[in-house]
Amino acid sequence: MSNNSKSPPNEQHQQQPHPPDVLVQLTESFQHFFQSLSPQYQSMTSLPSINKDSYTSVGSAPTTNNNSNSNSNSNSSNRSLNNSGSSNSGGGGSNSNKKVNNNNNNNNNNNNNNLQSPTQSQFPYHYQYSSKALHDFEEKRKLLIEQLKSVKINLDTQCDDDPISFIKIRMELTKVKTSLETELKSLDELLHTTSEVEEPNPTPIDSITSLLTMIMPSSISNSVTNNTPSSATPLTLSNNNNYTSSSLATSPTTNSSSSSSSSSSSSSTHYYNSSISSNSLSSNLPPSSIPILNTSNNKNSYPNSIIPQGTPLDNPDPNLPRFPQRDHISVKLYVDCDDYFAASAQAIENATREVFITAWFLSPEVYLIRFPSLDERYRLDNLLKRKAMQGVKIFIILWDETKIATFKGSKRAKDKLEELHTNIKVIKHPPIIPIYWSHHQKTLIIDQEIAFVGGVDFCFGRFDTWCHHLIDVNSTLWKGKDYYNPILGDMGDILVPFEDSVDRKKIPRMPWHDVMAGVNGLAARDVALNFILRWNHHKDDYYPQLYFDTTPLSPVGTSQCQLLRSMDEWSGGGRIERSIHTAYVQAIEDANHYIYIENQNFVSTHAPNVWNQISFEIVKRIKRAIRKKEVFRVFIVIPCQQDGKVEETQIKGLMHWQYSTIIRGENTIMKLLRRDCPDVDLTEYICFLSLRTHAFLEGTFVTEQIYVHSKLMIVDDRTIIVGSANINDRSLIGERDSELAFIIRDEIDTIQTKMNGQDYIASRLVFNFRLRLWKEHLGLLPQINYPPHDQINNDINNIVNLNNNNNSNINNNINNNNNEINNNNNNNNNNNSNEINNNNSDGILNNSNSFHHGSVSDNLPPLNPSSNLNSSNKKLPTTTTAAAAATTTTTTTTTTTTTNGTGTTNKQKTSHHRSNSFQGLVLQSPGSNRSNLSSPQDSPQDSPRLKNLAEEISPPPTEQHQHQSPITDINLILENVDTIIHSNEQLPPPPSSTTPPPPPPPLTTTDSVIIEDYKSDGGNLNIENNNSNNTILTNAATSMNNSTSSLSSTSLPTTTTTTTAQQQQQQQQQQQQQQQQQQQQQQQQQQQQQQQQQQQPSQQQQQQQQQLSQQQQLQIKKKRSSISPSTSSNKLLLSGNGSGDSIRVVTDSGSSPRGQPRSMSSLHDHADSSYCQKSNIDLIDPTCSDFYFGVWIATAASNTRIYDTVFPAIPKNSIKTCEQFAQLQKIPVSLADSKLLSEVRGNLVFHPLDFLEGEDLQPSFLFTDDLFQ
């Protein structure tokens, strides 16, 4: 370097006095010294920068870096102070570097050099870290060596029977081996150690796998281990030229470490403190490595990353969510696929711009609407094609399944959907690797303004109602592969979707229980952004780029939602994230009263080598409750067995890890609690449950588990976590399966309830969601008798009598649930059964027996969409209940009086259970002691609009107990046949011989009826069916709800109707006619009572009436199938005449159907109150001993005993081996024992914790444990 380059610093030094130079060098020396000792010093306020040209060589390379950024770690590592010992600095510059000042003597030179401290690059590595950190690094180095040995064993023992599978697996193993070796090399350099690992035996195929590995994009994540050392901040090893591109970063795990994060991420970390904070993380969380950072150009970026830097998505902490908490969100929760499919059908139907779908498994031929028949217009492929033809862009991401493990037909689904229209684009991902992990997200996004997240795929085997029917011999609801039972038979060839895979007359289907959440506003935008990031990461040049919608949205709801993910670079193109696990841990730690979990799997840290801490936190919270003598409950609902045959290897593996978490092992949940708390009854604190049901199929009883596929957790009636993540490492570790979930709270819309006997303020949304789930499990919801069952299916005692040839009294006992149509058509003669079972008395006709709280129902899990989406206002589909309960204020118990053959009368109390023998546990009578579940403004009778409507449509009080006669014409039914409801349970029971019939529901006149179009907002739906002498009344009046929680940026106006003077006059005339007809009917009833005592109707007359009823139903079905879409105007044109006809809606829906899609569940009313009148069960307090032991535990114990007694070959504690299980499958069901099934209540059973206890369930092959964890 020339002398001119050295003269400016020398001249500057001569002009300054000597002491200031010494102070400057002292200041810089201390600064460098502290920086070398503390990496966290980067985030502190540094000392003022000094011009280093005055005492360092101008020609030194690090000078530019120092001037550009004096506070970064890379600068401190690259900064080099020249001293007399730096003889290797290179070339002629070494002599000039030794001269700081030509006018100073040698002693001054030495003194100045002694004041310059060594830099971080000149410090030995073992001085830069604490002893604990070095110990952790050493432990990790040993662990990496063991993992490399395991990889070698797997490479050497790999079977080459299948060349394609051999290459795929070897590529994956080679990739893992390379990643482990890179990390081990970094640790060796840090610790100054030498690690030697034996290389695997070479094979001829290694050259091919190496070439493919170089071509295929590799995952950024460098950690395949679950237990790695912790560190406070990411430690970048870039201190010399050999490691400028390598780094080692670990995630914060302790309270102290999380508070000392680096300054580069402090702003984004603080962004989440109001929602999910790392300060609440358990100190027992084993850390895991985060992806390697690319530190080139002093920027923390990822190669090919699509995550914008400087945003919350770029947060380096994998435990924190990338998306912020969103306030004022409207949330709808859907239980079982019947409700969700109807809501999704309406949402897609009303899409105007875009539809995004992600799926683990997708069947284009799945039917979304199945009542009153399988609707071809709402088959998924037809619906998507129709919307694509209307100009809507449809983008779908499917998991490209591993062919060696499963076959879900993703290629067929992609080809079929893309053939429908050019506006449908489908991506399969990943192309080859990773082999073991999957895309497990299940989402539906409409116009980036409404989103659904949960565990439901649009595929076969998912559709179900809350009754979970087992049989469908006539393919009424489940067609072809949709009738599915993987436990007793395979799905078969998925390429032939409408061929049955099992024999419907011998094998029951496996019911499916699942949950979805719908959100709007910014929460939906977050789900859309997740999809867009994934799409842009997965796509190739053929597919278009997607863009995020930034249009402002107005908040309309009351809930707080935060999007959680399990993602990695391979699955989403960004940094690793496992915020779902963080949310679960924090919610469990913060629980005060109870935890309710439904999940497909339960594999956690109490099983060997499992990382996630869910079970650890549960045990810790239970121990705390025991120590403080608190009342604390943990409900865990999981499947009885996995969806497969128990002899299959993968099913055994799943069972092994689940049992290793719960009970089989010294450190399992139950063994640990029993050992640490030997004097405590653990049933008071934790219970493991499953769901099961039964049916009568072709002369024998069958049973099957209700497969729990939901992934949710409810805490203290205030917090919900719902999504697609199972409780296992696959879903929670972040590096494996891609998952999505929401954590939902609502601190604005609250309700006064009870908790452990004390007054408690709960979230109305969460409280009602729990009620909906528990009513289903306890059997407190009305029966949905569709598809219709055989006549004897619902009366077990009569089936036993039939087999004993006791035919003399059959007609006095047979259940007539499915013959009510015949009874109603033959009121004068038909007395086929004198003992009427009113299992369905909770249905839509008997609404006087249920509580109704208008505001509560608005926040219950919606059962069917009634409000619709349009281009300017987006609303999540809400429920349309089928009862006019808003006008009902009485809650008396209804009894049905029957007449036996001797003429005496017997009163039989109605029940909500499968049989009428169980009358419920009387825990608490409805009185003042029960808490008030609704404020005055919540009650429907306090709504002025509903009061006026009730006054208009309700008959006089004196007529309440008189049977109403028909006033409508059959033509009205045929005109409005799209929405008619003709299920058997909706028909009123025949009049009794000794007592007047039960009071009918309030009537509404046809003048106030609106047949809503799918683009309008909620309304009334009343249809009357003139069937000889009886009336079918269906009231789906969602406009009676005084507040509807809508998922929209702008609420749609509520459609109302005004009654003109002429209409009122017509209504009065109709009421007068009704009174006259009622008087005539009373006379007919008296005559009927006399005839009943004299003679019984002949079988020939009964058959004639039955044929007549069937002909009328066929006529209605033909009329329904002949209706075609209307093609007039885009606007609603209300037209009516003065004759009292119903108001008609004429729309221009193009190729879209005229009516809105409906679910079967929406046609049945379920009380919104926690108190169930029929059974005297109150669900308000989930922790009180009366409910917990008297109802919950007692129901599970009773059902478990009954099922274990009746059915020999089901998962139960007495079966210890697979051989024993196979032998018991050959034993038929005893009809004598089947009488016990009449006592089954709901579908709760205890999980068989000792099932196959004597069987070795652990998989025998290596390197596959993480598949099941």
UniProtKB/Swiss-Prot annotation:
According to UniProt, the reaction catalysed is: a 1,2-diacyl-sn-glycero-3-phosphocholine + H2O = a 1,2-diacyl-sn-glycero-3-phosphate + choline + H(+)
Q: Which domain of life is it from?
A: Eukaryota
Catalytic positions are 440, 442, 447, 709, 711, 716
Q: What is the protein's name according to its record? A: Phospholipase D A
Cited SUPFAM superfamilies: Phospholipase D/nuclease (SSF56024)
Similarity remark? Belongs to the phospholipase D family.
Indicate the enzyme's highest-level EC class.
hydrolase
Q: Which residues form a coiled coil?
A: 131-192, 803-835, 1059-1096
Q: What is the lineage of its organism?
A: Eukaryota, Amoebozoa, Evosea, Eumycetozoa, Dictyostelia
Composition bias, Polar residues? 55-64, 222-232, 1148-1162
Recorded hits in InterPro entries, A to Z, give: PLD-like_dom (IPR025202), PLipase_D/transphosphatidylase (IPR001736), PLipase_D_fam (IPR015679)
One GO BP annotation is: phospholipid metabolic process
Activity regulation annotation text: Inhibited by butan-1-ol.
Task: Note the CDD domains from the entry.
Answer: PLDc_vPLD1_2_yPLD_like_1, PLDc_vPLD1_2_yPLD_like_2
